[in-house]
């Protein structure tokens, strides 16, 4: 495995070109958290209430802003304020997938104005390298960062093989704006260091019947070299106490990171 993953997050921060990557790695070390929670709720009040509860235990809050039924600018302002209060970054999981000029408008404009408040967003690379360039023209001057979807955790995903290889190639050309990947593992042989965020993490279940396949924090961080675990329903699903579960996943993720460091 790439020797850089056996360095601490704070040591790796120094080698990152993107300012959000530097901030994120330093924040993770400071909070002792490599947990990102995917807040896929549809009501503004429920989202803000949950984020305020779990904010102290996460490094990143991941949103799907287009599923919020009562979205408004006040929600954005309150979410940003909670990020400052609890010291986490906001990742809008937009998965852009259009040509460069269109994604520029989707990122900067429209109802959501994503670039104005989300530190991090992501994209598919199906349209070609132009999608990265388009998003970069908006996000780089604002000090934002982009994750590329090199793989997906759902069963039967087509994001494999040559698709993944081309994505890695384009990443290397844009490390001022791109700082990592949404993927289930760390990729070998990349010249630049980067952050890997892995979805599909669960401590209690192995799947959801809709194609989602779950793995443990230890599997993805120790065995696969990932850096951040993304957990959703495992934290706030029916019958769960979000604070208790956020603490549990944070501890499991951090323990796995410490185990990885001890191997070198």
Swiss-Prot record:
Pfam families: OMPdecase (PF00215). Keywords: Decarboxylase, Lyase, Pyrimidine biosynthesis. It catalyses: orotidine 5'-phosphate + H(+) = UMP + CO2. One of its GO terms (cellular component) is nucleus. InterPro entries: Aldolase_TIM (IPR013785), OMPdecase (IPR014732), OMPdecase_AS (IPR018089), OMPdeCOase_dom (IPR001754), RibuloseP-bd_barrel (IPR011060). Pathway: Pyrimidine metabolism; UMP biosynthesis via de novo pathway; UMP from orotate: step 2/2. It is an enzyme of class 4 (lyase). Substrate binds at residues 40, 62-64, 93-102, 214, 233. It comes from the Eukaryota. CDD domains: OMP_decarboxylase_like. One of its GO terms (biological process) is 'de novo' pyrimidine nucleobase biosynthetic process. One of its GO terms (molecular function) is orotidine-5'-phosphate decarboxylase activity. The active site is at residue 95. Its EC number is 4.1.1.23. Belongs to the OMP decarboxylase family. PANTHER family: OROTATE PHOSPHORIBOSYLTRANSFERASE (PTHR19278), URIDINE 5'-MONOPHOSPHATE SYNTHASE (PTHR19278:SF9). This is Orotidine 5'-phosphate decarboxylase. It comes from Schizosaccharomyces pombe (strain 972 / ATCC 24843) (Fission yeast).
